[in-house]
Amino acid sequence: MWKRIGMLLLILPLLVISIPVGPVSAAATFSNPVIHADVPDSDVIRVGNVYYMTSTTMHMNPGVPIMKSYDLVNWEIVNYVYDTYANTDSHNLNNGQNEYGRGSWASSLRYNNGVYYVAFSSLSTGKTYIYKTGNIETGPWTISTLGSYYHDASLLFDNGRAFLVHGTDNISIVELNAEATAVKAGGLNQVLITNASNVAGSNFIVKAEGAHIQKINGKYYVFLIAWPTGDSRVQITYRADSLTGPYTGRVVLRDSGIAQGGIVDTATGSWYALLFRDSGAVGRIPYLVPVTWSDNWPVFGVNGKVPLTMNVPVEGYPAKKIYGSDEFNAGTGTGSVQQLLVNSGFEDASLSPWTSNNTATIAATSSEFFGGSKSLLVSSRQQTAAGVKQVITGKVTQGGVYTFSAKVKYTTGPATKTFNFSIQNGPSYTGISIMGSATLTKGQWGTIQGTYTVPANADLSQTFVFLETPYSSNPDPANDLMDFYVDDVSFNTTAATGGTSTGLAKFWQWNHNPDPANWSLTQRSGFMRLTTGKVSPSLLEARNTLTQRTFGPKSTGTVAMETAGMKDGDYAGLAAFQARYGFVSVKLSGNAKSIVMANASSGTMTEVASVPLNQNRVYFRVMCDFTNQTDKAYFAYSLDGTNWTTIGNTLQMSYTLPHFMGYRFALFNYATKSTGGFVDFDYFRVE
């Protein structure tokens, strides 16, 4: 059947499927899974007649999606909690490091006294983060960092106090201050439930975790999952009359592994749970489960089973999706991040438009670099302000807010040294401001980063940014005027408001932290331009891979791409992305282009098929079949967007724990020899 459907897709023009925005009423019934896509670890709240949900997206950014619904069935992504939350080698895919399968996990979403809170822990940093905002759909968010990792933490606000419930098997509680910004000194800190798994069995693949604590009608409920050996995952509930217990527990759902999550009520008093099920390569997909009550215990499902067809809890709202097509026409609006510096990674050895500041010598070098293959060496310094600068006159505005970052390294001199990232507004040195500083360790790359607001009365007739060491009227050559290296410098615009500022449709996420210098929706109007900023051995190490979820039971993604800007050794195209990925791409070898299908299902990327390409515009298609966990992907290309040809072999998709994520459609461009090549994506269309 799929082959016949696939052939129709290859010979018929693609019908553009977009997210409905008109007043189209949803059906009175729906079928589970409620979202046939990767949405694990969900947490749902209701505020008035609106439901909000968060989920785990780990190494994808922006991170922790905020999804919105009026009926618990039709969901759309309206915001993210952060653009990025850390700036390390693993987050940036540098020096062979990554955070696949780690990143942000199992967020907790709460609303208390007019403020929205999101808490999550990170396996990458070993810390727990709490974000809060007064407007969950636009932000801005403020962040508090807890120095400890609290596994699968769940927030609770109770009688003016704040808590986190967390852990595996032995479920613990720690008290926060009333603002939920730090652990409260001397506050409650104890185990709530010992051996919480025991109500589900004696041997386990995964012991009880995924805590969700809620106070309902004066009682405290802790919802957990466990995975007994020889069984599927089960939903557990513990109940107590007081916060510290004692708690009694039971298994409340044992059905096909559907588990993990709390419960939420409707305005009319009905109750539901959004729980997920491991479902092969498409990922961990959510089911909407009815919940009733018996003797103050929640009863999940109907006769112990999750219904496959149900009435929509609240009727009359339009259909929504968390995936969609994109013509890339929205990038000229406000709010998109723009990198204001050129040649920020110094891969162009001419260094233009960088120049020396005061008396110094600057040169590109490959002897030291943080990202890509080159950095900039500053030497022969005569003053502490001597360094490297770039003029940005006309690019900034009075009152404008900008983020900045630079990697700096020095190898001679004192054990530690402070470096400044500075700006000069106007022709006089009196307009100099130190935007940010960092104390670096000799022999190690360090980061100077922060946010800078241009003064409302700044003289913008001349503006430049530069890197320096702190001022000294009598600088010591060894301790103040040492040579230093600079790499990956950024000075970016920010959104005027909002939690995130990518300028992209909300269904898109980058694989790891994006490099804002090397993607653009404005360099060519109506196109997404991806430029290579580092040399990468494979797709898994490449930055600025743009992804969105595949979905079941079948989904097809199509791109139109223009390739005139590619360089020798570049690969660019469309992938079915996970650890065992496959793609169809253009490959440039010397001056010869070819269309290549690659398959990495064995763990190693193999080029399976190749055909010559003698034009700049090309169309690619990836077709995914998740029916009954068939988990196969097929690849095709077209030279005119109408007539399609299959290429290569079938990718047997597999859900792997190193990535711990369902397959995604991925637009990519990566360099294997030299940087600076670019491609322009005209559209991505999904059905």
Predicted regions and their residues:
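Short non-domain terminal segments
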Residues: 7, 28, 155, 326, ...
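Extracellular and organelle-lumenal recognition/adhesion modules and their flexible linkers in secreted
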Residues: 336-500
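Carbohydrate-active catalytic/glycan-binding domains of CAZyme proteins
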Residues: 26-338, 444-447, 458, 490, ...
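Bacterial N-terminal signal peptides that target proteins for export
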Residues: 1-9
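Hydrophobic alpha-helical segments, especially transmembrane helices
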Residues: 4-5, 375, 550, 665
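Sec-dependent signal peptide cleavage junction
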Residues: 16-29
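Hydrophobic helical h-region of N-terminal Sec-dependent signal peptides
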Residues: 10-15
